[in-house]
Amino acid sequence: PDIVTPESLNSEAGIQTLRAGSLGDLAVAMSGSAAGHGATTGLIVMSGLMADEYAYSGTFPTRREADTRNLQDINSDVNTIYGNLHRSRTGAETTVDLLADFGGNPEIESEMQSVTGYAYVMFAETFCGGVPFSKAPADGGELIYGEPLTTEQMFNQAIIWFDQAIANAGSNDKLANLGRVGKARSLLGLGQMDAAAAEVAAIPTDFVYNIEQSDNSRRQENGIYIMSTVRRQFSIADGKGGNGLMFRSSMDPRTPWDGGTEFGQDDITLYYNQLKYDSSNAPVVLASGTEARLIEAEAAANADDATTVEDIHNALRATIGLSDLDLSGISGDDLLLAHFSERAFWLFSTGHRLGDLRRLVDVYGMMPSNVFPWGPYFKGGEYSTNLKFLVPQSESNNPNYVGCLD
């Protein structure tokens, strides 16, 4: 703060600095980084522990809390993710605000509005309701404390930002599609499956928008790679807690791995290394045409249209040489679970799985004990019935803070 002052950002060059900072904060919030004591965990690996993607093979108690879902509101890893998501959001909002003083730049506005929308989505999918969204004035004035929002309100706020992003994208299809996938993802969270499918219908399957990582600094390195391959703390799971998917034993090319011959960082847990991110500069997909097709498939599954679900999935599987699925005779919850299984393999370790499992419970009405890891925990104790990150106690400096609403 003593190097980059609010006054120095109030220029066209400053706007580019703010944009880069917001994208950097989003990258750290999502994938983590090599910086910090023991590196920095991101939402992707921590939410993967809360779900069935990863098992913890390290010694940090805050990360083991996520593996069992037995979280405290003083969990430092969750607090870091929470702060980085908010920093990314407020940086993007400030960028949009300052652009108005320089005649505007619709493409930068669109990208930053989508970044803001994705922050709301990530909070809605992974945290409990009750997250306040405070405003940091562009002139460096006092923080304007936000009111806590329910999960539904967070998804609705995301849609408002994505609508603005789509409108400002103009002829830039990549930015328009980024906003459309984000809006559709929000609509899924609200249970509006047909509207979500309609939103992504025109997106080509080969579309992709990446969160970029780099070897330029430790902060820019891919934290998923650092936490798994380098530090051996996050082991790719297999049938976690009884309900988890077989991410290893399926030998599926979408979840490549190696290992099983040495222990993790804790020296007691056999370690299985993910290979999806094979270097410290491997990018992370934020939105894609593949996700667009999966959204369409979910709408079809919700309508009990097994033929369409099968056609969409087999077209995707053919792109990487996988054999066809046969979903004939499958309906209802079984069809939904077949779809969600495929979706989990395509979107493995991208920050979707916890939100997907919560949607199976909150939108589709399935029992948590039938979809989340459940029962005895492999290091002793039980998996918690909690399904979400808590609003950190650090937010209690906000006079509107109430903890979790839902």
Where are these regions (language model features)?
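Conserved, well-structured interaction surfaces
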Residues: 58-126, 164-173, 280-284, 302, ...
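Inward-facing hydrophobic residues that define packing positions of alpha-helical scaffold repeats
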Residues: 19, 89-92, 96, 155, ...
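Hydrophobic-face positions in mid-chain alpha helices that act as interaction patches
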Residues: 50, 60, 159, 191-290, ...
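Membrane-proximal, proline-rich intrinsically disordered regions
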Residues: 1-43, 325, 365-406
